[in-house]
A protein has these predicted regions:
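Extended, compositionally biased low-complexity polar/Lys-Gly-rich tracts
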Residues: 122-139, 143-147, 187-210, 253-256, ...
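Ligand-binding face of N-terminal immunoglobulin V-set domains in extracellular IgSF glycoproteins
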Residues: 34-44, 55-57, 77-160, 278
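Predominantly extracellular/luminal regions of secreted and cell-surface proteins
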Residues: 157-202, 359-392
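Acidic, Ser/Thr/Pro-rich low-complexity intrinsically disordered segments
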Residues: 19-90, 99, 161, 200-360, ...
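Sec-dependent N-terminal signal peptides
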Residues: 3-13
Length: 548
């Protein structure tokens, strides 16, 4: 990626003094079921005057119930003095204490309780309560929620619409102990020794909760022998980045216990994704308990989670990982509780689409315009290398640990070639390594990892890429393997071998701007240049509002 260009947006009218930008740190619960009405709380900063809620997609209706800012110490002292006076009055004449005074005393106690339980992080100290109604036909999936204030809109938060019954734990503000400081990072935190009893839930269910320091949230349910239980935790999926939490997000861990309290399964991740997924075939009828906690027992209001729990469909892998645009591709599907091991997918346009067989989790499916081919075994040596006609995208697998796939192609002197693997970016566990040699075995290029700045949430950019001008006419060999010598049916890949296809993508930061009248607003436009594209890029506002 070349340095970002600075685009300056100027809105008409007079300049005003800049105000703090509104910020949303979390929404809880972070979703709800079709056909239900419920309340959510948004925690953030500079939310005073909030006047609207924007939720992407149709079928969901929202309204603001209440804005609440954190109380100052001086205001708390005033309330304490008022409470003392009311208590004196009550003690002096208990039998004749007016009902209105009792109500006022209870309200003061509630406000003081909120004061001592307030978040220690100013970035989530203000709250907005919102009413949400989801139409029965609202499309399930993830949406974006933002708040609008006189000073602009907040950053977006993930908000999920589901089809399963939901159970929501009381907000952390209502259940945490008075006087407890709650930074996201705390030293020497250990699990709570006074854990509450498990909460009973009925499968299938989506469980909403917030993890506090040292807490382990427990949920008990009845399960029958032979049930194929799936527990899917969403944590980083909801809030990808928490600035003062290491490694930068809520790292959830799941544990499953039987009726005797024995741990029978555990997960603190799924494949290379930080959010854990647990699969367990129930061996006997009984009561089971699912537990969730932070991996190092941190916690705070913005450690929000959703657990999908039940005999649910879950896709663990597909093959091939993509297909040609406009063509019908037969896809093998692997996973749990799936009605069919196959589906047919027709890619619409070049890019990456999401497919969700049988209302399961969504998995990426790459679509391209180049010819497609399947890897043909055996092809693990130069002697049986699979011949390629360029350009082509090969769909293959590293079938076993230590396996490698070898391909050969013919080229002329001066030909420029690109060999690029797409695997990790398509949810494959493959950590590819790619090697190019000439016909005599001389190594011309090798690559393990290539960073793709368009895949920002990947913690390991494991896909390989080689771009090289070939020195002579002849036959060339590509060797593709797993850098960790792993392999298996899930280790799928797409290997593009072609001449360069120069192109670019743009990303704009920040994700939203707040433009007051007369203000000059800088935004950064990042150019992701593909296959050596080095041309100029003209940037302009599309459908710009009047005055910009």
């Amino acid at each position: 990626m070349k340095p970002a260009a600075l685009l300056v947006l100027v809105s008409a009218a007079f300049a005003q003094q800049p105000q703090p930008a509104p910020h949303a740190g979390y929404v809880y619960p972070a979703g709800g079921r079709q056909g239900t009405t419920f309340e959510v709380t948004v925690g953030g900063q500079a939310l005073n005057g909030v006047n609207n809620v924007y939720l992407s997609g149709p079928g969901v209706h929202v309204s603001i119930i209440e804005y609440e800012r954190p109380m100052t110490p001086a205001e708390a002292n005033t309330l304490r003095e008022q409470a003392q006076e009311l208590n004196k009055k009550r003690q002096a004449n208990p039998g004749a204490f007016p009902a209105a005074d009792m109500q006022k005393l209870l309200e003061i106690r509630d406000k003081l309780a909120k004061f001592v339980r307030r978040p220690m992080n100013a970035a989530i100290a203000e709250t907005v309560r919102i009413g949400v109604t989801v139409d029965p036909g609202a499309a399930p999936g993830s949406r974006e929620l933002r708040l609008a204030t006189p000073n602009g809109m907040t950053n977006p938060l993930a908000f999920q619409i589901g089809t399963l019954p939901e159970w929501t734990r009381a907000t952390a503000e209502a259940i945490s102990a008075p006087g407890v400081a709650r930074p996201a990072q705390q030293r020497n935190i250990t699990p709570s020794t006074a854990a509450t009893a498990p909460i009973d839930v009925t499968l299938p269910v989506v469980i909403n909760g917030q993890i506090m320091p040292g807490a382990i949230d427990r949920y008990r349910f009845a399960a029958a022998k032979g049930q194929r239980l799936v527990a899917i935790a969403n944590a980083r999926e909801l809030i990808p980045y928490i600035s003062d939490a290491v490694p930068g997000w809520f790292q959830a861990a799941l544990a499953l216990r039987d009726s005797a309290g024995k741990e029978v399964d555990y997960a603190d991740h799924y494949s290379f994704h930080p959010d854990p997924v647990l699969y367990y075939e129930i061996p006997a009828d009984g009561q089971y308990t699912i537990e969730i906690h932070d991996s190092i027992y941190r916690g705070r209001e913005d450690f929000v989670y959703r657990i999908q729990l039940g005999e649910l469909p879950f896709v663990t892998g597909i093959f091939p990982l993509g297909g040609k645009a406009g063509a019908r591709t037969a896809v093998e599907v692997k996973g749990w509780n799936l009605p069919s091991p196959r589906l047919a997918e027709t890619g619409k346009a070049k890019g990456v689409e999401l497919v969700s067989p049988a209302n399961s989790n969504a998995v990426p499916f790459a679509v391209d315009t180049l010819p497609e081919a399947l890897e043909k075994e055996p092809n693990d040596r130069t002697q049986n290398a699979q011949k390629l006609k360029l350009p082509v995208i090969v769909n293959g697998r590293i079938n076993r640990p230590g396996d490698q796939d070898v391909f050969r192609f013919d080229a002329k002197a001066g030909d420029e070639i690109v060999a690029e693997v797409m695997a990790r970016r398509l949810d494959s566990p493959l950590d590819s390594i790619l090697r190019l040699t000439d016909g005599k075995g001389k190594e011309l290029a090798v690559n393990d990892d290539t960073e793709d700045k368009s895949a920002a949430l990947l913690t390991h950019h494991a896909d390989s890429r080689i771009m090289l001008k070939l020195p002579a006419k002849g036959t060339y060999y590509l060797f593709l393997a797993d850098a960790q010598h792993k392999g298996g049916p899930d280790y799928a890949y797409r290997l593009r071998v072609s001449h360069p296809q120069p192109d670019f993508e743009l990303r704009v930061t920040p994700s939203g701007i707040n433009a007051r009248s007369g203000a000059t607003i800088p935004v950064a436009v990042h150019a992701i240049r593909r296959d050596g594209f080095d041309g100029e890029i003209a940037v302009k506002l599309k459908d710009a509002p009047a005055g910009f």
